[in-house]
From Swiss-Prot:
Residues 160-333 form the OBG-type G domain. Mg(2+) binds at S173, T193. GTP binds at residues 166-173, 191-195, 213-216, 283-286, 314-316. The keyword Metal-binding applies. Its cofactor is Mg(2+). This is GTPase Obg. Residues 129-143 have a biased composition (Polar residues). The gene is obg.
Length: 392
């Protein structure tokens, strides 16, 4: 299946149903009074994270999602039916951005997590709500409010513990094939990975971590050159970055300069990403003897000003790979993710008598009190009756 990590969709919540103006008309009951019911609330639009999805390709074609409108109120005090909600399923790791405001509405990081992205409109009130001792036959009603409407930008960010960095042909795909069951394309000629891939590295029955392979970076990537910059966002949730350096580049380029390009592009893209823990890993040491590889790796590290530990591996022959993976596993165990739970303020519970409806009733009472020409002997059959219309 084609990998798609960005999509734009339109979500429209349902409008609230209108209130009803109706009077009880029954045999032998000459003054039945008002019996107009309220409308129904509009349906909401929700996003739900689903671990069975791994791409946003479904939303390249289906771009509009609309919830159902609430039904209008009816006579005999019948309340309109609430509109049905719409649930849009997205892959785990999807970030939701409101295109109108640029606000990040939420990150879908757990399976089953739900996020309301469009709230349905409030129901309108029927004329039964406006009856009083001085207004026995009210002809007022309120209209339902419109539902929310938003253009959303969906951005899929892969959830991985370890991210791979490096130039094209540094051996990232070969490494992920060596340590996991993932099978990205590899070959003995220059080319680059086109889409990100994930691999699960199982150290034993209880310990494992996820590694992400993204297309290689090239010089000028921060300005849009190549593919890598587009997929760098997938590394934002990684806990450690493995910077693979080809110790003997096939094109004869300088490994030191290649490493500096990667670090420079990383800093241009995001200071937060550049500040993540980064490990230096020299690959393809099987192309020379051990002493030569160690001497060359040490010289490159010194040229880069690298003072921490570095690793020598061969992803093709798996030399040093197991030691590296165990060190990564130990780092992940010793540095667990700290979930900072924000103090959530209690949500305002708004039922039938929310602020909107209360305001409508208060305005109606003011209109009745200010009406100097009120006729308490008004008859339902009077054709000259006045109907009140309220605008939101």
């Amino acid at each position: 299946m084609k990998f798609v990590d960005e999509a734009t969709i339109l979500v429209v919540a349902g409008d609230g149903g209108n209130g009803c103006v109706s009077f009880r008309r029954e045999k032998y009951i000459p003054k039945g009074g008002p019996d107009g019911g309220d409308g129904g609330d509009g349906g909401d639009v929700w996003l739900e994270a689903d671990e069975n999805l791994n791409t946003l390709i479904d939303y390249r074609f289906e771009k509009s999602f609309r919830a159902e409108r609430g039904q209008n109120g009816q006579s005999r005090d019948c309340t309109g039916k609430r509109g049905k909600d719409v649930t849009v399923k997205v892959p785990v790791g999807t970030r939701v951005i409101d295109q109108g405001t640029g606000e990040t509405m939420g990150d879908m990081t757990k399976h089953g997590q739900r996020l309301m992205v469009a709230k349905g409109g409030w129901h309108g009130l029927g004329n039964t709500r406006f009856k009083s001792s001085v207004n026995r036959t009210p002809r007022q009603k309120t209209m339902g409010t419109p539902g929310d409407k938003r253009d959303l930008q969906l951005e899929l960010m892969l959830l991985a513990d370890v991210g791979m960095l490096g130039m094209p042909n540094a051996g990232k795909s070969t490494f992920i094939r060596a340590v996991s069951a993932a099978k990205p394309k590899v070959a003995d000629y220059p080319f680059t990975t086109l889409v990100p891939s994930l691999g699960v590295v199982r150290m034993d029955n209880e310990k494992s971590f996820v590694v992400a392979d993204i297309p290689g970076l090239i010089e000028g990537a921060a300005e849009g050159a190549g593919l890598g910059i587009r997929f760098l966002k997938h590394l934002e949730r990684c806990r450690v970055l493995l910077h693979l350096i080809d110790i003997e580049p096939i094109d004869g380029s300088d490994p030191v300069e290649n490493a500096r390009i990667i670090v420079g592009e990383l800093e241009k893209y995001s200071e937060k990403l550049a500040s993540k823990p980064r490990w230096l890993v020299f690959n393809k040491i099987d192309l020379m003897d051990k002493a030569e590889a160690e001497a060359k790796a040490k010289a490159i590290a010194e040229a880069l000003g690298w003072e921490d530990k570095f690793y020598l591996i061969s992803a093709a022959s798996q030399q040093g790979v197991k030691e590296l993976c165990w060190d990564v596993m130990t780092f992940i165990i010793e540095n667990p993710i700290v979930h900072v739970e924000e103090e959530q303020k209690p949500e305002k519970v708004e039922f039938m008598w929310d602020d909107y409806h209360r305001q409508q009733l208060e305005e109606a009472e003011v209109e009745v009190e200010d009406d100097e020409d009120w006729d308490d002997d008004w008859d339902e059959d009077d054709e000259e009756g006045v109907e009140f219309i309220y605008k939101r």
